[in-house]
Every structure is written in structure tokens, then in C-alpha cells.
Amino acid sequence: MLKTVLVSFINLICALSYADQTTQNPNLTSVASNVDVASNQSDDLLPAEAAVHFVQPWARPTINVQGKVSNSAMYFTLINTRNKSYQLVNISSDKIGGIEIHQTINDQGVNKMVKVDYPFLISGNINVDFKPGSRHIMLYDPKVDLNAGDEFQITFFFDDNTQKIVNVKVANDNPYNKIGN
């Protein structure tokens, strides 16, 4: 119970602190400016799949040791272009056995990963970084090796019964930080 309350509180604080934050990546700014789609539709009518965007998604490679594939993590910037809030109710991939949202917290000087339960609230007009050492997606029990240079698909499911398929790049470091350098 206390863990659930703590995680909910952390999610609220993170969402509020990220809501006004602009990204430091100039490449993301140019991508995000192109994200606003169907702006002539009412916020109440626009499905989550059209309003919510997973910008510059990437995941770390796995390591295969004696046939056992290590877990991985996925990062991106989550953007909701509308005033309306949506809820993420599940994430899946045919390449990954289990997928969870995690938040890194500092507990008495020790960083710990905490699972964030569904449904995950995506507030209106929000721009949230899922990045190393912070909020991220854990990829458990990959069914295949994820090697640098590979791509795979992941599906996000929303409470309005829509879904969004996202192509994820596999890289040792954020491949989008290298664009234009």
C-alpha cells in the first residue's frame, strides 16, 4: 500500500515537473514541432493513438551469455499534444517477454528502480523524458538478441481501446544525440 502511494506521488511530481520542461536536444525540438497532428479536431474526439507520441525511441542492446539473453531498457520522449489526458494500460512486443514502466528513485542515498503500475496517466499537453537513470521502460526476457543497429516494434495500448505501434532503434547510447554532429 505504502509503495503504491509512494509511486503514485512520484508519478504526479514527475509529471508536474516535466510538464513545463523543454528538451535540451535541438533535434527533438524540430521533431516535436512536427508532431502536432489533426489540430482541427476536438480534444475530446481525438484518440490517444493520434495525440500521444513516443519520440526518438531507442533501447540498449542485450548481452547473450550461454544462451541467456539479458534484460534491456527503452527510452524516448513522451508527448501528448492535446489538453485531454489519456491512460496507458499495457505495453507489449512479440520480441519481448515482459515489459514494465519503471521510475528510478533515491532512497536514503541509494538509487532504486520502482515498478509503475498501470494505468499510467498521460496528462494533457505534457512532454516527459524517459531516460537513463530516471523513468524508463524495462524489457524483460527478450525472445531474441537485441543488437546495436537492430530495430523492433513495441505496441502501446490506451484506455480508449486504441494502440500505437512504435519502431525502436537498438543502440549503445542515444542514437538521436548524434544527429547533425
UniProtKB/Swiss-Prot annotation:
One Pfam family linked to the record: PCuAC
Highest taxon above the source species: Bacteria
Gene3D superfamilies attached to this UniProt entry: PCu(A)C copper chaperone
PANTHER family found in the cross-reference section: BLR7088 PROTEIN, COPPER CHAPERONE PCU(A)C
Protein name: Uncharacterized protein RP573
Taxonomic source organism: Rickettsia prowazekii (strain Madrid E)
